Amino acid sequence: MTTPSRLPDPYGQGQSANLADILERVLDKGVVIAGDIKINLLDIELLTIKLRLVVASVDKAKEMGIDWWESDPALSSRARHDELTRENAALRERLRELDPGRVPREEAP
């Protein structure tokens, strides 16, 4: 004869969640964690740190309007190329102003 367990099942009857399921759900829906740290001395605010953490998939982040990695030269080769192209054009224009006859026009790619 079996006796029923006295401890409840933490996930409910017949439900189980493994790490992959939890991670998939978090990345699909997204999670925001926010917190502030303030250091005061005699009612004088010395330091305030505001923490904001968003955990989401790239697709979900883009859906929310977060795409800073696409324009950050440290993270995107396309952004670095665009930045260098703009800088090159500005330098060519400056050279043209200084010595109009010496700098050739940019060739079309």
Curated annotation (Swiss-Prot):
Keywords: Gas vesicle. Interacts with GvpA. It comes from Streptomyces coelicolor (strain ATCC BAA-471 / A3(2) / M145). A minor component of the gas vesicle, might be involved in nucleating gas vesicle formation. Gas vesicles (GV) are hollow, gas filled proteinaceous nanostructures. It is not clear what function GVs perform in soil bacteria. This is Probable gas vesicle protein J1. It comes from the Bacteria. One of its GO terms (cellular component) is gas vesicle. One of its GO terms (molecular function) is structural molecule activity. Belongs to the gas vesicle GvpA family. InterPro entries: Gas-vesicle_GvpA-like, GvpA, GvpA-like_CS. The gene is gvpJ1. Its main location: other. It is found in: Gas vesicle. It holds the Pfam family Gas_vesicle. Induction: Constitutively transcribed at low levels, repressed by argR.
